[in-house]
């Protein structure tokens, strides 16, 4: 089983890392450098307009692109799972995972990325901002979906092929923006979606903040259970969520929560 996650805009390169934490390098080495060269040609104002960010954030990321190095070291990079710091990763709580948890996650978790394509949890990552939906023009097309093409799907195929035959399934916990980067025409394993709904104003609905956190909770649940199939995820019960069987299908698991007013 492979779990897909989105990255986060918020990054943490300040909190000390656990001692002797292992690391790997990103699976795509040339493509990030190609994108960095394109990004370096953007002025702060152009970057602000392209990404819809403030002048301050644009200046920060111009500096990040200039500092980006082909060499990933303990000084300029850190493991992706511990660098991301948004709602999903607050649910996942990577810092509380032990060495065996991280080893399992390294084999079963894939973080989709506009700059890196795919990151494994222990891949060193230099700080960046480049959302997958950014309309960045490159030699490969007018956006990042065209830039990455079928590469991400083919990488996921390779990772799935290394797993036991009965465990080759993709569990999508990523947003639509990021999952769109997986070319389904080339993807071989079946995909199972997970949806998280909260009760509000008389109906169950997806509430972005809660759904993002729940995706991280589900990833943590799978890691700690060493889940081998999507069926094992049906037992997910963290923070009040439970499977809604009548609203679920084998390809789409719906989890609902009704909190007290």
UniProtKB/Swiss-Prot annotation:
Pfam families: H2O2_YaaD. InterPro entries: YaaA. GO terms for biological process: response to hydroperoxide. GO terms for cellular component: cytosol. HAMAP family: UPF0246. Belongs to the UPF0246 family. This is UPF0246 protein Daci_5283.
């Amino acid at each position: 089983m492979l779990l897909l996650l989105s990255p986060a805009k918020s990054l943490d390169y300040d909190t000390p890392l656990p001692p002797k934490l292992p690391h790997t390098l990103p699976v795509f080495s040339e493509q990030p450098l190609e994108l960095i060269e394109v990004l370096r040609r953007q002025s702060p104002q152009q970057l602000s307009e392209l990404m819809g960010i403030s002048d301050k954030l644009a200046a920060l990321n111009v500096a990040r692109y200039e500092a980006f190095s082909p060499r990933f070291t303990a000084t300029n990079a850190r493991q992706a799972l511990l660098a991301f710091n948004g709602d999903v990763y607050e649910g996942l709580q990577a810092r509380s995972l032990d060495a065996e948890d991280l080893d399992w996650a390294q084999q079963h978790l894939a973080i989709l990325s506009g700059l890196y394509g795919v990151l494994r949890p222990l891949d060193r990552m230099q700080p960046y901002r480049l959302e997958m939906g950014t309309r960045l023009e490159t030699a490969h097309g007018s956006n990042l979906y065209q830039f990455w093409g079928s590469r991400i799907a083919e990488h996921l195929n390779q990772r799935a092929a290394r797993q036991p035959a009965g465990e080759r399934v993709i569990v999508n916990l990523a947003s639509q923006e990021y999952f769109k980067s997986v070319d389904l025409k080339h993807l071989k394993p079946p995909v199972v979606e997970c949806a998280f709904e909260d009760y509000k104003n008389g109906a169950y609905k997806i509430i972005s903040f809660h759904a993002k956190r729940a995706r991280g909770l589900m990833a943590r649940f799978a890691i700690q259970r060493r889940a081998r199939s999507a069926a094992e995820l049906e037992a997910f019960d963290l923070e009040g969520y439970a499977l809604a069987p009548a609203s679920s299908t084998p390809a789409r698991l719906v989890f609902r929560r009704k909190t007290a007013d």
